[in-house]
Amino acid sequence: MTFRIEKLRRDHRVEGFDCGKEPLNRFLIRFALQSQLSNSSQTYLAFSQDEVVGFYTLAFGDVNYEDAPERLRKGGARHPIPLMVLARLAVARAWAGKWIGSGLLKDALARTLAAAEIAGLRAFAVHAKDDEARAFYERFDFIASPSDPMHLFVLLKDIRALIGP
């Protein structure tokens, strides 16, 4: 099974997307393009032919030094740590269990490595919405924040080891 990933455009038809979680559906259908046009975030769609089978959204952010896991703090100054934030990731119900989520995550990680070549980034972060999501990210060696176990991070050096340079 192959799919392609494209940055969200006005002409993409996303209205029929359904991942089973209304807030994610609503974001993609009503707010993703608006957020992208305001440069608040960037959304990428996964397609099987012309069907949207999943999406993810990236934004830059940071984490306070005190809220970061020890591995993120090590070797850095006591300032906020720059991050790429995976703001959203969703897979259409009909495509669940077919590794689309893993493919989307790996694409997001690869784009993060590219962004790190032009701006400072130390890690990639996500706020898992539930235990199932947390377990998904932990399979990719994400580590939890000491202040919130649902805030998960992976260092760029670990991303390189996971997906290559």
Where are these regions (language model features)?
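Conserved beta-hairpin
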Residues: N39-F60, D67
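Short glycine/proline-centered loop/turn elements that form peptide/ligand docking sites
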Residues: L105, D130-A133, P149-L156
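Conserved acyl-donor/pantetheine-binding loop and adjacent beta-alpha core of acyl/acetyltransferases
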Residues: F55-R88, A96
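Conserved acetyl-CoA-binding loop-helix of GNAT-fold acetyltransferases
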Residues: G97-R111
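Charge-rich, low-complexity intrinsically disordered segments
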Residues: S145-P165
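Short amphipathic alpha-helix that is part of the acyltransferase structural core
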Residues: M1-Q34, S38
